[in-house]
Amino acid sequence: MAETLKEDSIMIREVWDYNLVEEFALIREIVDKFSYIAMDTEFPGVVLKPVATFKYNNDLNYRTLKENVDLLKLIQVGLTFSDENGNLPTCGTDKFCIWQFNFREFNIGEDIYASESIELLRQCGIDFKKNIEKGIDVVRFGELMMSSGIVLNDAISWVTFHGGYDFGYLVKLLTCKELPLKQADFFKLLYVYFPTVYDIKHLMTFCNGLFGGLNRLAELMGVERVGICHQAGSDSLLTLGSFRKLKERYFPGSTEKYTGVLYGLGVEDGTTTTVAN
């Protein structure tokens, strides 16, 4: 079970340009059996705030997300796969496998970033020079993602924590375009690529007394971290474990009615933009 995994039982598969094709080949082999995917991204923080005024917070939240995602560049994506019982793939090894994809686009010497975010990532072991030299091209990643079976697939359930920015970067990567101006158009794209989405932060609003970030939730749920905080692979595994514990404790029945909502988004000009799955 994902929530009882220990450090020595996990292999974080570091993915660079040289092994990207091989790792996606492994993912294609497991995706039918391991159809829950917990996802986390690392990016250069939030640097822009819209100058316009908005009547509704969700409109402000989306515009802030759009302007930052359009401008900034992805650093890491972490993916943890599990089956419906929380079991993780081993991919022919004696360890459970999760994936951490490292991208080349962000250049700390040339690109805009939030200083505190980059310093935190550096302290957590991200080597920005290595990413430039050996990292993945985002366009190539998007092409392989499209043919991998993990997107455009009704059988896959995606799990994030406060996942607006995570999905914003993936939608930008998959479309090779800036995010739509209208939030409703963003959600239309989201549901094409990711038909079933869970945002743990949204689920927590139905759990009396639960608040705060992923680390706090994991601690409350008794889920131990494996790997380094603020690296996408480790965070995606912690997301999966927390999701499973939350479901067991607070949602004993079906959770389908909670899909399709990203925390802080989903209302435009006072009208709901999300749709039932």
From Swiss-Prot:
The keyword Glycoprotein does not apply. It holds the Pfam family CAF1. Gene3D superfamilies: Ribonuclease H-like superfamily/Ribonuclease H. One of its GO terms (molecular function) is RNA binding. It is found in: Nucleus; Cytoplasm. A divalent metal cation binds at residues 40, 42, 166, 235. The keyword Metal-binding applies. Its EC number is 3.1.13.4. Keywords: Cytoplasm, Exonuclease, Hydrolase, Metal-binding, Nuclease, Nucleus, RNA-binding, Transcription, Transcription regulation. GO terms for cellular component: CCR4-NOT complex; cytoplasm; nucleus. Its cofactor is a divalent metal cation. Component of the CCR4-NOT complex, at least composed of CRR4 and CAF1 proteins. Belongs to the CAF1 family. This is Probable CCR4-associated factor 1 homolog 10. The gene is CAF1-10.
